[in-house]
Amino acid sequence: MAETILHLTESSFDEEIGKHKEVLMVDFWAEWCHPCRAIAPTLEELAQESKGSVSLAKVNVDDNPQLAARYGIRSIPTILFMKDGLVMDQVIGTVPKSQLKKKLDALA
């Protein structure tokens, strides 16, 4: 499943976001964040189940603080749902898979 995850940085973010026409879940996380690690498998499952229509990207906020600031990330995990380079929705904290799926379905 690892090949379906984009690991974005401040230098690669805009270019990579521009390449994706499908819905992109962008997970702002940190290594030390237990809730971030808890929701990661759920995000990976959703991306795998929706392959072709949804992709998963991860941004480590410790390594990319300017990118986190640019999107107003104050709590992690924060998942941005982006389409055509625009933020369409977001989720803060850990939420059930069903809630994430509803948000993805609304953007499809």
Give names to the regions the model predicted.
Residues 1-26, 30-55, 63-78, 82-108:
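Proteins that catalyze or organize thiol-disulfide redox chemistry
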Residues 58:
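Conserved residues in the N-terminal Rossmann fold of short-chain dehydrogenase/reductase
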